[in-house]
Amino acid sequence: MSDRLDNQRVVRAPRGPEITCKSWLSEAPLRMLMNNLDPEVAEKPEELVVYGGIGRAARNWQCYDQIVAALKRLEDDETLLVQSGKAVGVFKTHRDAPRVLIANSNLVPHWATWETFHALDRAGLMMYGQMTAGSWIYIGSQGIVQGTYETFVEAGRRHYGGSLAGRWILTGGLGGMGGAQPLAATMAGASMLAVECQPSRIEARLRTGYLDRQTADLDQALAWIAEAGAPGAKPVSVGLLGNAAEVFPELVKRGVRPDLVTDQTSAHDPLNGYLPAGWSLERWERGRERAPAEVIAAAKASMATQVRAMLAFHAQGIPTVDYGNNIRQRALEEGVSDAFAFPGFVPAYIRPLFCRGIGPFRWAALSGDPEDIYRTDAKVKELIPDDPHLHTWLDMARERIHFQGLPSRICWVGLGDRHRLGLAFNAMVASGELKAPVVIGRDHLDSGSVASPNRETEAMRDGSDAVSDWPLLNALLNTAGGATWVSLHHGGGVGMGFSQHAGMVIVCDGSEDAARRIGRVLWNDPATGVMRHADAGYDDAIACAREKGLDLPFLG
């Protein structure tokens, strides 16, 4: 669609205390929408693509302009409705209602396929919102760094006596999500070999400090990895220009043994996200326009080849995990009957955190001043003094993570801490300690906000993997509680037909009204995750629910 391409337009969120909307409650979503399209943040801002293949912030540039205009005239007792990246209505509500309600990429289940989506997308009736692209709370690769770091650290505990020092990880994909992997690996003490087919993505990760080195030579890459494995050597992350469907099997053939194997290519989208083996980027780009069925068939066959290599590593006893891009499902569809022999990362490493409502809590400084983030970092340490792992993360993040767009931070905290931090940040705005309001949000990948049987809800204890009532309830409760904007999406992470998920963002503007909303929303949101896992029979979640005094009738 030509109305999606504008090479002349550069979008950047305003900074500072002056606003162009009628209040911070509408200025905040305006700035975060614009921040999603900042060239420092977005993968292809000229096409409105933020990350994740074709995850967009708005349906087309006309729709973007209409959203911006609607936000600038929005009153504090009105709510803007956004349907798959298009502003479709402004309605009278009340001051504590969300200023924006967003629904992206949702399809009736029988029609929830990429084929149906692409037809609607080509007709200009829909866009793919991914998770935080269409919900306007993407913060660049930092948004996934800590979750990836936590996963790698837990893998070290589980498989290697507590540490990944001297070990190395093999992966594919350095896009908006996958680009977090190299930095997360070296933070966790491991080296990484990351295979990426697009030079621009490797260069972007080098530029932002997420990646240490690049090469197109596999032997050179392996030599660097070997050097970093020597006693006393520092871990290194290497971006290898190549195709994972070719490199992974070659490593198996050579008898190379990584210490952990995973993948974050955009396999969720076989048309736009995965380069078929043997194809050039130019052939791939032409094929997507002229012969999409051929591209999809070739991509899925290549995914099957990569998964067979991952299964070979798994059979050798090497820890191997799916990192949530649905590559196992694609391989299964191509006849790899044992594609699910290795687990997803959530049941393997993350679910115990979800049982306590712990997940990706993120915030951004609307002032644009990094000092506001550093002050909030200090506040987190002050309010959670007895978590050395969290403190280590915050110290490493300040030292090693480059801000992309508006300064922001992510840290994994849970029920009981999120609302305390939110209230503290709001008080810092009120006192003038922060130069402008902050927004608090999260990934849709959280404990109570997603149904995704091949990722977040894989292998639930009670078999409820595919029950999607939970993210709907999460969105409804956050709307009732007064989040500033709430989103409900389909297909994020794993593609059409495989997930439903909800997001929320709340503004800390220093007001007493904001404090009341924050107290409700940032308690209720993680509490739904504890509720969901308690209902599934997880003892840790049941204990957490009782400890926190949650009123869950099924517990008696």
From Swiss-Prot:
<dbReference type="InterPro" id="IPR035085">
    <property type="entry name" value="Urocanase_Rossmann-like"/>
</dbReference>
<feature type="binding site">
    <location>
        <position position="130"/>
    </location>
    <ligand>
        <name>NAD(+)</name>
    </ligand>
</feature>
<dbReference type="Pfam" id="PF17391">
    <property type="entry name" value="Urocanase_N"/>
</dbReference>
<dbReference type="GO" id="GO:0019556">
    <property type="term" value="P:L-histidine catabolic process to glutamate and formamide"/>
</dbReference>
<keyword id="KW-0963">Cytoplasm</keyword>
<comment type="similarity">
    <text>Belongs to the urocanase family.</text>
</comment>
<feature type="binding site">
    <location>
        <begin position="274"/>
        <end position="275"/>
    </location>
    <ligand>
        <name>NAD(+)</name>
    </ligand>
</feature>
<dbReference type="InterPro" id="IPR023636">
    <property type="entry name" value="Urocanase_CS"/>
</dbReference>
<dbReference type="InterPro" id="IPR055351">
    <property type="entry name" value="Urocanase"/>
</dbReference>
<feature type="binding site">
    <location>
        <begin position="176"/>
        <end position="178"/>
    </location>
    <ligand>
        <name>NAD(+)</name>
    </ligand>
</feature>
<feature type="binding site">
    <location>
        <begin position="52"/>
        <end position="53"/>
    </location>
    <ligand>
        <name>NAD(+)</name>
    </ligand>
</feature>
<dbReference type="Pfam" id="PF01175">
    <property type="entry name" value="Urocanase"/>
</dbReference>
<protein>
    <recommendedName>
        <fullName>Urocanate hydratase</fullName>
        <ecNumber>4.2.1.49</ecNumber>
    </recommendedName>
</protein>
<feature type="binding site">
    <location>
        <position position="323"/>
    </location>
    <ligand>
        <name>NAD(+)</name>
    </ligand>
</feature>
<feature type="binding site">
    <location>
        <begin position="264"/>
        <end position="268"/>
    </location>
    <ligand>
        <name>NAD(+)</name>
    </ligand>
</feature>
<feature type="binding site">
    <location>
        <position position="493"/>
    </location>
    <ligand>
        <name>NAD(+)</name>
    </ligand>
</feature>
<dbReference type="GO" id="GO:0019557">
    <property type="term" value="P:L-histidine catabolic process to glutamate and formate"/>
</dbReference>
<feature type="binding site">
    <location>
        <position position="201"/>
    </location>
    <ligand>
        <name>NAD(+)</name>
    </ligand>
</feature>
<comment type="function">
    <text>Catalyzes the conversion of urocanate to 4-imidazolone-5-propionate.</text>
</comment>
<dbReference type="Pfam" id="PF17392">
    <property type="entry name" value="Urocanase_C"/>
</dbReference>
<dbReference type="GO" id="GO:0005737">
    <property type="term" value="C:cytoplasm"/>
</dbReference>
<feature type="binding site">
    <location>
        <begin position="243"/>
        <end position="244"/>
    </location>
    <ligand>
        <name>NAD(+)</name>
    </ligand>
</feature>
<keyword id="KW-0520">NAD</keyword>
<dbReference type="GO" id="GO:0016153">
    <property type="term" value="F:urocanate hydratase activity"/>
</dbReference>
<dbReference type="InterPro" id="IPR023637">
    <property type="entry name" value="Urocanase-like"/>
</dbReference>
<dbReference type="InterPro" id="IPR035400">
    <property type="entry name" value="Urocanase_N"/>
</dbReference>
<dbReference type="InterPro" id="IPR038364">
    <property type="entry name" value="Urocanase_central_sf"/>
</dbReference>
<dbReference type="InterPro" id="IPR035401">
    <property type="entry name" value="Urocanase_C"/>
</dbReference>
<feature type="active site">
    <location>
        <position position="411"/>
    </location>
</feature>
<dbReference type="InterPro" id="IPR036190">
    <property type="entry name" value="Urocanase_sf"/>
</dbReference>
<keyword id="KW-0369">Histidine metabolism</keyword>
<comment type="pathway">
    <text>Amino-acid degradation; L-histidine degradation into L-glutamate; N-formimidoyl-L-glutamate from L-histidine: step 2/3.</text>
</comment>
<feature type="binding site">
    <location>
        <position position="196"/>
    </location>
    <ligand>
        <name>NAD(+)</name>
    </ligand>
</feature>
<keyword id="KW-0456">Lyase</keyword>
